[in-house]
Amino acid sequence: MGSNKSKPKDASQRRRSLEPAENVHGAGGAFPASQTPSKPASADGHRGPNAAFVPPAAAEPKLFGGFNSSDTVTSPQRAGPLAGGVTTFVALYDYESRTETDLSFKKGERLQIVNNTEGDWWLAHSLSTGQTGYIPSNYVAPSDSIQAEEWYFGKITRRESERLLLNAENPRGTFLVRESETTKGAYCLSVSDFDNAKGLNVKHYKIRKLDSGGFYITSRTQFNSLQQLVAYYSKHADGLCHRLTTVCPTSKPQTQGLAKDAWEIPRESLRLEVKLGQGCFGEVWMGTWNGTTRVAIKTLKPGTMSPEAFLQEAQVMKKLRHEKLVQLYAVVSEEPIYIVTEYMNKGSLLDFLKGETGKYLRLPQLVDMSAQIASGMAYVERMNYVHRDLRAANILVGENLVCKVADFGLARLIEDNEYTARQGAKFPIKWTAPEAALYGRFTIKSDVWSFGILLTELTTKGRVPYPGMVNREVLDQVERGYRMPCPPECPESLHDLMCQCWRKEPEERPTFEYLQAFLEDYFTSTEPQYQPGENL
């Protein structure tokens, strides 16, 4: 993403330097794939070039569950009953208990799972301390499985792996292993590299699986397991751009909810500490839940919405889980309503763009941020949900320019007359598609229109859309066919994308899936000759 990223400093990050070894220089670039080979392994798992493959004594551990990423990491999550009767798990991170019923543990601790049928929090017994309590299921992985390896990142995308590895503080050879996006059952080794022509970049090597077991990048060098492959390339570049040096740094994922059965919580369990912002309908605070857990708290003015309608909608909202959506943790459902979410320490995207950091952001960072937002909205699209109020003020920013969509679905519940009139003073008319503003037809396609407006906010570093025009004028002009011109220094190709989002007929606007793909590949497919300008 560029030099604006900074390495996570807290003790929660999982990072390990691999054993230094001799420097073996090899050619850069990916290896050609050949036919499925059959060659034997030596005692260390590395197979020589001239003998028949002997399957390992123990079968490769089965993959367990899926993956779901948070700010900067994906972590194993339960996808069903424990695979193959596995009940012993290993902790991937430290966890400090938040209630009397959950269990503290340290990274590397082995845990016996007592009951995993209760959703995101499992009852577990620590084999180290002898204590029993609830644990977040996405903080552990089956013992001796691939997920338990620090370098295994599971189902993250190629783009997300680059986002993590392109941290200026990562040394050459920083790496991770992920599932292949294109070949079922295969993996990909992603490695950070540096050269004078490209600067910091990432190379991706497909790890192929043998029919009879084992793995290889190039057919001349084969291994019984991924662990042996990683150990070998940590000592020898052997054709990679660089030998593997350091596991890609990661931060703890968000837990799914605050604790076991902590959904409707008492107001007294929250402490409001630092006021972060104020809007038409309430305030946003940084605070603490139960004296243990940092959270963000949105307080709504009484009368903003019906508590019953809010609680019903919140039940739907809490099921929306994606690494690019701000996670809803808990609610206080009696007025004044409190909405408790994960805390994002850089605040709203709008304030971030207008602040000190905004002036240093260039097009690659801004396009990457827009791709993250499109990724979150593509999930909303797949879930047949509608945001209704997509704009920079409702996007939150965390470390390393991570962006997450917030406040999805709340706009539908607001009962204020100045808002429900749709052309009242509190209604975000400049972001709203004409069919939604005029006739109340809010759909995912009206969200696409709003995303086009959000792109102008990004490329102008937070300027209000339609400068010099009042709401009524905007509505009239847009109905007559007016569309905002290309912002200064913004490539025409990006303005063309905005105009696609602003097509009059909703069904002619692109999908968020398309927008995500376009933006993620923007500098390879659309603007490969990009050169930084004064502002972009």
From Swiss-Prot:
Post-translational modification Phosphotyrosine, affected residues: 187, 419, 530
Subcellular location as annotated: Cell membrane; Mitochondrion inner membrane; Nucleus; Cytoplasm, Cytoskeleton
Reaction equations catalysed: L-tyrosyl-[protein] + ATP = O-phospho-L-tyrosyl-[protein] + ADP + H(+)
SH2 domain location: 151-248
EC class: transferase
Modified residues (Phosphoserine): 17, 75
Annotated spans, Disordered: 1-49
Family to which the UniProt record says this protein belongs: Belongs to the protein kinase superfamily. Tyr protein kinase family. SRC subfamily.
Protein name in UniProt: Proto-oncogene tyrosine-protein kinase Src
Organism, scientific name: Rattus norvegicus (Rat)
Lineage of source species: Eukaryota, Metazoa, Chordata, Craniata, Vertebrata
